[in-house]
Amino acid sequence: MATQKKKTSGRKKSSTRSKKKQSASFRLEITGVILIAIGVIGLLQLGFVGRGFFALAEMFVGLLSYVLLAGSVILGGYMVIRRKMPHLFSKRLVGIYLIVLGFLTYIHMYFIIHNLGANASVVSSTWKLVLENLFRPNQVGFVGGGMIGAAITSITYFLLDRLGTNLIAVLLIIYGFSLVSGISIRQFFSKIAEFVRYLFTKGKVATEKGKEVKAKRDKKKAEKIVDVEPDEVIDVIEPLQEEKTPPIISNFSSKVEQEKAPVEEKISQKEQDLEMFQQESFENEIYQLPPVDILAPAKVTDQSKEYDQIKVNAKKLEDTFESFGVKAKITQVHLGPAVTKYEVQPSVGVKVSKIVSLSDDIALALAAKDIRIEAPIPGKSAIGIEVANQNVAMVSLREVLENNPKNNPDEKLQIALGRDISGEAMMANLDKMPHLLVAGATGSGKSVCINGIITSILLRAKPHEVKMMMIDPKMVELNVYNGIPHLLAPVVTNPKKAAQALQKVVAEMERRYDLFSHTGTRNMQGYNDYVKKHNELNEEKQPELPFIVVIVDELADLMMVASNDVEDAITRLAQMARAAGIHLIIATQRPSVDVITGVIKANIPSRIAFAVSSSIDSRTILDMGGAEKLLGRGDMLLLPVGSSKPTRIQGAFLSDAEVEDVVNYVISQQKAQYSEEMIPDDIPEVEGEVTDELYHEAVELVVEMQTASVSMLQRKFRIGYNRAARLIDEMEQRGVVGPHEGSKPRRVNVEVSPEHE
């Protein structure tokens, strides 16, 4: 009996053990299936749950969320197939962990430098972005290496700075590869050295084989020529030699130099006769361009409210269209820095004009201050409805320059403007524009735009490559640039001297065209190429021509003082200066036809319009409406040459402190060397008595009548036209009357005294 009881108790124990094993394996299978499901749903981002899993993975490992979810699938598969937990801290797995940690550290270091800024709090800034991404998946975007990357980087960056952090990341990756592959670090580097030697020897063998093949080909050609009969050799070779002689490079270049030698003598003689300004002849090799880091990084603006508003507005738009019987749907939405653009695709048979006519109703439905409708969007079968954001995201000049998709260092006149509605960095090449008109109401962002253009050029071009002439009648906007080596002359602030400065630029343009005609070149680029060839072959070096950018900050004031001289100079420069490498940037507050005349508009094809008060002003600038609906504070419409419709841009902001930093950096590199011939002459003061005995009587008459004209003096004093005109000119020089203003009467600057009355 005792033996039977022992047997039954042993069976019970074995059965309970097997049951425990079965339940444990069952739990492992369930866990494995759950891990596989989480990984697959997260990787494919299936629905709200999938996006949530993916965002949760991004929260921990950022850009490597795919690796984490793939690891979840692999771990789950192992648990289902093997029905046991893997050893999570084996040698190879530890190596994989180290590789992942190294990549997370490197990725988050890159994220800090390019997105958060070097001075940002790493953990707190990342935590904010991660939380926002968790609750709004696929809307925040790149979050670096997640919280794990942020935790490691915050420690290493504090202790070892940027270079040390990157070094730690590389060492972690190398050691991880060593653990995974089972190769020691010494063997790892020796393998790399062997591979480099192998590539070097392969390349050497390939070049030797190439030489052998070429030698065999030459030998075959020589054999073919020998096989030909002697009579044919003489007949064929002589013409061949005659034909092949000219294309030889050495003979051709020497022939060119022989032909152009007398021309150079003429040029040097002509240059002695011309009054040319003494520019910097050659490159200053010590000069270094200012780094982009000198500008302040962009501040991150929270636009989370805008995402919520987009869905609400899209629904309101579709309901509004439906209530007016218009069949249309919202196909795409672009959230920009200051404006959100809704792309509306109308159904077949719906007129575009019908949607445009609903602009007031759409503004009412969206409770928007104002909306702008782009109908249709160029290159798309859709209509754009632009609605202002609740919070405007600031666009800094630094972020536009850093995210430039077409960054070419050779383009010295590439300027940064801002970001368009889709968030793309907007750049423009001034040499292709080739002249630019900037207009808008006061406080709309013109001066910041001009400062951004000048700073963009200073960051790209050295003083011998680009020169500038600045005219600032307001005396406060451009004075900060006095002393930079790029200036041809100090900033011109006297409106009367401004016309003279423009005339000197016209004279420089004519001098350049004279040089082109004597060298047989067509433009500045061709002339500079010619000078480079000349300098390579001659000891006497000739200077290359720099670009010249003429910046006029307030055209309206100049047109009031000397409209005829200013308009003539601007017209001549706009018509002819492009090939000479001279480009105009003209800014004005008052976009009226008296200031922006038809002749000026016809010759300045590229325009930038800031916010204006009426559609008439918008038509004066752009020849179309739209600028009256802009928001101000840098909101602009760019109409480049060759474009039929303008592009809406949020202008890049540049503070006064940033401008001063760039100017101080440039001046520290090189001092200004002004050209005496380009500095406007001092306006001589009128001295001495007037010889005409009628002058004082004429002044009394003009002051009494409070009007001045040549015909009035002719009638009152019974004198000829020439004498009356001289009297008026004398009064203008002495400040009694103002300048000639077209059909308007001259302004009398002296009031009638009470005693005279």
Swiss-Prot record:
Cystine connections: none
Binding site for ATP: G443, S444, G445, K446, S447, V448
InterPro entries referenced in this protein's UniProt entry, alphabetically: AAA+_ATPase, FtsK/SpoIIIE/SftA, FtsK_alpha, FtsK_dom, Ftsk_gamma, P-loop_NTPase, WH-like_DNA-bd_sf, WH_DNA-bd_sf
Cytoplasmic side: 184-757
Topology in membrane: Multi-pass membrane protein
Taxonomic source organism: Listeria monocytogenes serovar 1/2a (strain ATCC BAA-679 / EGD-e)
GO process terms (BP): cell division; chromosome segregation
Gene: ftsK
Stretch list, region Disordered: 1-20, 735-757
Descriptive protein name: DNA translocase FtsK
Coarse class of the protein's main subcellular location: membrane
Record localization: Cell membrane
